[in-house]
Amino acid sequence: MRASIHNYIASCTQCARHNILRTKSPGHLKSIKLPSDVFQVLHMDFWGPVRTASTRGNRYVIILTDNLSKYVIADALPDCTAKSAAQFFIERFILHHGAPERLITDNGTHFNNHLLRAITSSMNIAHAFSVSYHPQTNGQVERFNATFAAQLAKYCDPEQSDWDLYLPSIVYAYNTSIHSIAKFTPYELAFARSPKSPFDSTSPILILPPAHIFYPYLQRTRRLITAKARTNILHHQSYWAQRYNQNRRDPVYRVGDLVYVQVSTDRTKLDARRLGPFIVIQTSGQQHYLVKDNLTGRTDWYHVNQLYPVIERHHYY
């Protein structure tokens, strides 16, 4: 009797779609594999739009963050089109630093399009997409977004018409500040040296040794600080993963399983918190699932913490 009552309640469709979950969201914390060197894995994202365009006509910021060094490149733009994203990626990164091995973006049309697909495929760049409404997948950029937006708000005028004038200075300050996790500045990790600040006093002329001596020294320095930063980051990831995963379910779904999907867009007080049931049609590891709505035929990728299992109701005769 107890088991049948428990199953009857757990399998209630309306309850599953509307109830507030009082437990931790499912899914263990799994970090993206840390690259061995800088500028191998990049994260790119758009921020905006601001309420009104600046006097220069800009409403968006496009941001590129290196996964290992945390080095940031950012520009203010009037739009968030595929053309703007592709032009920024080529002119501001590839023509300066070469092609990365992997690029991670969201699944918006400004990144998921024929133009950027042609660029990445021609340069042998693996282009990975974060799942819908799950910014944690592209968390490197999201963390910088939170940092620089607050700084822009403090410096721009009350009409917010000149915010883009301060963007380069804020990016420079970020790149030359010691990162709390890596314990080095992003600039130092990216280029194996500290930048000369505009406020530094004039120093005597530095005489460098011959290139055949200095270059091996520079390479050794890069290897040492990169290895140290990787150790610091991996230690931090391990520590927080252990804390996050404690007492947290890590469900695994299989193709054919029925699930509800968390509603992440605007909803009113009486709207369902989850939609479905939908069916899992493809898996990617243990955290990302391609889910299909059989009524509309629409498919989309979701993170495991956006899914809720459908409990089959037992029938007793």
Predicted feature locations:
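Amphipathic alpha-helical
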Residues: 1-39, 233-240
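Classical protein tyrosine phosphatase
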Residues: 1-21, 75, 84, 115-118, ...
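Domain-scale segment recognizer with a strong primary affinity
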Residues: 12, 41, 99-100, 109-295, ...
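An active-site-proximal beta-strand-loop segment
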Residues: 37-72, 266
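Eukaryotic intrinsically disordered and solvent-exposed regulatory patches
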Residues: 27-30, 47-50, 58-60, 88-91, ...
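Short small-residue beta-strand/loop micro-motif enriched in glycine and branched aliphatics
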Residues: 70-75, 128-130
